[in-house]
Design a protein with these regions (language model features):
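Residue-level recognition of conserved structural "scaffold" positions that shape functional pockets
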Residues: 8-11, 33, 141, 147
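Membrane-anchoring hydrophobic helices of lipid-metabolizing enzymes
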Residues: 17-130, 164-169
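Short, positively charged and aromatic/hydrophobic N-terminal segments
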Residues: 6, 10-18
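Catalytic core of membrane glycerolipid acyltransferases/transacylases, capturing the structured
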Residues: 89, 122-178
Length: 178
């Protein structure tokens, strides 16, 4: 609405950059969403290792964080963190652009659903607390399909506004809300 109009009238460069980024993100997300999950995970392995070598500051931060957590990090463990982080990132397009029914089929084993079912049967409320690393968007989509009511997720919007719009479009469909 009005905010978009203000951007267009007062700062055409910002509007053009936002539009370009939105189109670019949407294009690549749709491309990745069409790929088999196994291929995305293999790609994540390669990209995660590349990021490990290219991002010295991030690599050092992971080593420091692991030491702070009382772990003895080695190169293999830190590379695994990068691979898993990229894997989670490459799963986002799947969560945002595939049909919920096809996402549901990706889950081959679910542990602990009996606790959710017991709470539902007892008429109790539910609060899911999930880590911010991993397949939380895929899991949220899966859970929202199985619940008899909408699933509302809270999150901190990304700094890149175009990415937030793509995320909202992907999360707020079916029985998902933010």
């Amino acid at each position: 609405g009005i905010d978009c109009l203000r951007i267009r009238l007062y700062n055409p460069t910002t509007f053009l950059w936002y539009t370009f980024m939105y189109i670019l993100i949407t294009f690549f997300f749709k491309l990745f969403a069409a790929m088999p999950l196994r291929l995305l995970h293999a790609l994540a392995g390669v990209l995660g290792c590349a990021v490990y070598y290219l991002r010295r500051e991030d690599r050092e931060r992971v080593f420091d964080n692991m030491r702070t957590a009382g772990l003895q990090p080695d190169e293999a463990a830190v590379k695994a963190v990068f691979r898993e982080t990229v894997k989670g990132g490459l799963e986002l397009p799947v969560a945002f652009f595939r049909r919920p029914e096809s996402i549901e089929k990706l889950f081959v084993e679910v542990r602990g659903w009996e606790h959710v079912q017991a709470a539902l049967d007892a008429g109790e409320g539910l609060l899911f607390i999930t880590p911010h690393i991993g397949s939380y968007d895929l899991a949220g989509r899966y859970i929202s399909q199985r619940l008899p009511f909408p699933l509302t997720a809270m999150y901190k919007p990304p700094k890149l506004k175009a990415m937030d719009e793509v995320m909202q479009a992907g999360r707020v469909r079916g029985k998902g809300k933010t």
